[in-house]
Amino acid sequence: MTGVVRKVFESRQLELEKHQNEGKALQEAVLSWLIAEAKETEFGRNHAFATMKGYDEFTKNIPINTYEELKDSIDRMRHGETDVLWPGRVKWYAKSSGTTNDKSKFIPVSREGLKRMHYKGGFDAVAMYLQNNPKSRIFDGRSLILGGSHAPNYNLKDSLVGDLSAILIENINPLANLVRIPKKKTALISDFEIKRDKIAREAMNKNVTNISGVPSWMLSVLTRMMEISGKTHLEEVWPNIEMFFHGGVEAKIGRAVQQECRDR
């Protein structure tokens, strides 16, 4: 299976190689796209996005905004207003732990952001992994994707607020469900103790080749799985495990958790 799926990633691998020394140009292109997309929003009109050209003009005319300065605009978006900071209606909001004033922040997650940043970034990570590991059999088994939970946003239709990982799982390509565990219903359980037990039981008898998620959460799930299975080492449960994709924390924390996983 991996040999067949690998071909899907080949063209992107070539693009990534081509772009290795084009960081500045790529970032300028992204900025131009963002300005063009948002020019008819309230924020875009207030800051003359329609006539704005380039990075220098952007930095000269757009102040650095704190979350608190944008909070009123985000609250209006959460209540269903359109064309405020981004065109159309933004339905999803990632809830982050509050680092200022002990209050949570709600980060708008647009459909374009999901497609062009989060999912594309995940695709690119797999593309680079396959390129660097020609003997990989990662698609010959299952992917354990660990996420948080979400809840209705002000009871607005189809609008959700919660962990970014839960929003990603909720909107994932249905084809990914063919190789992903746990079931969506399990993945989105809000009580983590119940969730980690169910995931551990669901995953321990599957041929898992790769895992994804916040390292501290993943370690908790793996610890529970080892308790239930009675095994000493992770490879005894998943002999074909080869990759841990992670984010959400500082890289050195991820590496520390990876080492703990290896030791189990």
Model-flagged regions — what are they?
Residues 96, 256-263:
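Conserved small/polar residues in nucleotide/adenosyl-binding loops
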Residues 1-95, 101-245, 253-254:
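Nucleotide 5′-phosphate-binding alpha/beta core
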Residues 23, 263-264:
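Terminal presequence/propeptide segments associated with secretion/organelle targeting
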